[in-house]
């Protein structure tokens, strides 16, 4: 399963819009973090584009519990690593993101392995999720993993929008995708990681 020409052009357009902001991100964030104290949850307003819309500067549960436990997630270094890993979240959500409430749930379609994101390189797999917005615009999320033979390495590709979060959405269950803990806006994504290690 490969992307259509229209989908490839959409990825290229999003890339062209976001890459200058991504470059700026690497320059601004180290200085913006200097304006934060240990109790801060977000970057200063003047640097809001570079913040993470869901978890701010201190990371999600995995970041806080596995990577930087016991409050270490609030150090300058942990925050810098988090924001370098999760770049331009507010910009992406505000200007290019998919508002979950605006998705026409009757148009959500899934091709491939709906559990592809849980695969972690165990086998070759993919999932393509497509939908239409209420205004008729089409959106897609393409996730793929390619294992390198019998090695312990694989390639992970995620393009379009982070629509793996709406796999299984229908008109009769859309409300379950809009709970308090669910993401309200799904960001754009163009991530290709050619060297991921399989964890046994």
Language model: regions and residue ranges:
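A hydrophobic membrane-anchoring feature enriched in long, contiguous, low-charge segments
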Residues: 5-38
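Compositionally biased, intrinsically disordered low-complexity segments
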Residues: 32, 101-106, 132, 149
């Amino acid at each position: 399963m490969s992307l259509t020409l229209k989908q490839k052009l959409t990825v290229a357009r999003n890339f062209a819009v976001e890459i200058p902001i991504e470059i700026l991100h690497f320059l601004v964030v180290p200085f913006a973090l200097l304006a934060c104290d240990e109790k801060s949850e977000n970057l200063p307003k003047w640097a809001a584009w570079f913040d993470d819309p869901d978890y701010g500067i201190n990371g999600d549960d995995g970041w806080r519990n596995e990577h930087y436990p016991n409050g270490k997630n609030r150090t300058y270094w942990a925050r810098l690593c988090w924001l370098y890993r999760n770049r331009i979240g507010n910009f992406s959500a505000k200007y290019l993101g998919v508002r979950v409430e605006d998705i026409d749930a009757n148009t959500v379609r899934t091709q491939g392995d709906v559990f592809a994101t849980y695969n972690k390189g165990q086998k070759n797999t993919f999932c393509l999720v497509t939908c239409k917005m209420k205004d008729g615009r089409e959106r897609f999320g393409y996730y793929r993993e390619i294992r390198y033979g019998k090695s312990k390495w694989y390639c992970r590709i995620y393009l379009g929008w982070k629509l793996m979060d709406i796999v299984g959405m229908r008109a009769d269950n859309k409300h379950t995708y809009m709970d308090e803990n669910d993401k309200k806006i799904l960001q754009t994504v163009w991530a290709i990681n050619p060297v991921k290690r399989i964890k046994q």
